[in-house]
Amino acid sequence: MTPQILRVGAHATLLAVQTDRFKSELLNVQFAVPTKEKTAQRYALLFELLRRGTERYPTKAQFYRHLDDLYASDIRPYCRRAGDMQLLGATAEFLGARFVGGGAGLLPEMCEMLAQLLLHPYLPNNELHAPYLESEKRHLRDTIRARINNPRGYARSECRKMLFAGEPYALSLSGEEESIDAITAKGLTALWQELTTTLSPTFFYIGNTPPEAVAALLERTLPLAGDQKNPTKTLVKMPADTVLRREEEMPLCQGKLAIGYRTDITLAHRLAPAMSMLNEIFGGSAASKLFLNVREKRSLCYHCSSSLDLYKGAIFVGSGIRVENRAVTEQAIRTEFEALLRGHITETEWDAAKRSRDFVCRQLLDQPAALCDFYMGRHMLGISETPEQRRAAFAAVTRDEVAEAASHLREGAVFFLKGTLDDGEGDENE
């Protein structure tokens, strides 16, 4: 299932997969911009604000009511991170053409709705609607204040800031509360105009309409005429030899331990499949070393897992522990990592990781949204690969390659959120 790549207008690009495999179709439009302290929060707020109302549908209720009339179609604006880049866009999902009379089906109408969202927002007095903005600013404040209510996420975020200090990856996309008041309707309107008139987007479509017809339709209905493509570059490097350490206290029963590792292996590296296998074996599943050995056999923690970011080159380990178990848990995690360096992987761990990676690749082929993320991410990095090819790459990974990938990882930061309450005093959802 390989996408056809076409030009839309003079500068935009379309990745299109023509298939009748799915009952629904998907159309995505995405901009990639560098993550910067000055603009990250404003972009995040802008893409929440755009869904509040458009020229034809001045309220959010009217906009989504019309989507409901289109066989319960949906459009979701988003703002997320990919390495040092900030991805801004919207995804439309709608019933396939063969279920609504054939031809292009709902695709023309969904292009019009995306055009309303991105090109024709509600602009009374030629500016984004100030009352909508104030409402979204209040919501953003609440979101920022609520970070502390997710101790596990807070610990990981603080570890990320330590490990990538001074780099775009350390920035929070939602920003800090102190900078919200300075955001104005006039300023956000200018940011929206700059985005939609200077930058060229990438489109992704999966459905039954021929790619050439989709490209022509997009050129007519979504004339995003920007001629600039931001360089999608991400700084990739190993950390210094010194491991950074920091601790905070919070009224919790548990302690939250976060350990960050950096690597020079990213999605385009030959060892990327091996690094994915490494993460699966290390702490990526219930059959991993961290779960079975640190949590189950030694009962050192309430939870212990790892996550991998191949856009940036990072692995984060997160664990919820009794405060008094901090030192022994840290050492236990390092012991499991050292086992990977030596290539000590049991048959059970190896087989479980192979099956898990194979399942993920097969599952991709059944999910239009997952296929969109897969192809858009690789296109952004100049990688030509299909899920079938990635599946074959996982099948070919050897234990020696996993050990080699482990040698490219280096611990760089440890953050500990120290709980100050006795058992029974805290929130059971910690």
Predicted regions and their residues:
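Short, polar/flexible loop-turn hinges at active-site or ligand-entry regions and domain interfaces
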Residues: 53-56, 97-101, 120-129
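Glycine-rich, mobile lid/loop segments that gate access to catalytic sites or pores
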Residues: 140, 144-148, 159, 163
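Short amphipathic beta-strand starts and helix->beta connectors
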Residues: 11, 71-76, 180-192, 297-304, ...
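His/Glu-rich zincin catalytic helix
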Residues: 1-71, 176, 189-293, 330, ...
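M16 family metallopeptidases and their MPP-like homologs
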Residues: 15, 23-43, 60-116, 152-175, ...
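Short, flexible, solvent-exposed loop/turn segments with mixed acidic/basic and small polar residues
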Residues: 80-82, 189-196, 305-309, 403-407
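Acidic/histidine-enriched alpha-helical segments
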Residues: 64, 120-144, 231-239, 335, ...
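Short, low-order "capping/linker" segments at domain edges
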Residues: 142-146, 242-256, 359-368
